[in-house]
Amino acid sequence: MKILVLNCGSSSIKYKLFDMTTKEVIAQGGIEKIGLKGSFLKLTLPNGEKKVLEKDIPEHTIGVEFILNTLINPEYGAIKSLDEINAVGHRMVHGGERFSESVLLNKEVLEAFTACNDLAPLHNPANLKGVNAVSAILPNIPQIGVFDTAFHQTMPDYAYMYAIPYEMYEKYGVRLSLIH
């Protein structure tokens, strides 16, 4: 079983491809400067050699597509076919209070996650672009969301409440989340 993990940031995408039978990372890398001049993919080949591939990457969808194509590239890839990928995991930044554990991404989950965009305006939209790009290229692959905010959902209220009017917490969900 092979699992691809993506971390889509505001101007970057990091990835690792895990072979769960051997419990090894078989491919890893990252795209930097998405939407800027001089964007590139830095990757580590299965033999440990590091490479930099320069490419104009104007947005995340093209970045995810470039990563997937690189994974199956005869010169740089770690797998022969995208069919070898059994699931994709996504680091998702702010899931509000709704997501206290990892979840299978579906329409309802993505709508609820989108509703949290104001809480992480640089990261949540980028996370969604990664999910949508994978859905377009690998429509039958299960995708899992792992939320930064889930790690601290068990804190007592006195530990996560800010000294602000309680109505702001109720209306906007503003609370200590310890992300970043």
Q: Predicted segment positions?
A:
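Short glycine-rich, Thr/Ser-proximal phosphate-binding strand/loop in the N-terminal lobe
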Residues: 3, 12-58
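Conserved active-site "lid/cap" helical segment
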Residues: 37-86, 116, 130
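Short beta-strand-loop/turn "lid" adjacent to the catalytic site in phosphate-handling enzymes
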Residues: 77-123, 151-159
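Short glycine-aspartate micro-motif
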Residues: 3-5, 87-89, 144
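Non-transmembrane, aqueous-exposed alpha-helical and coiled segments at domain scale
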Residues: 1, 129-130, 138-140
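Membrane-proximal intracellular helices of multi-pass ion channels
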Residues: 2, 72, 154-160, 167-177
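Conserved small/polar residues in nucleotide/adenosyl-binding loops
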Residues: 180
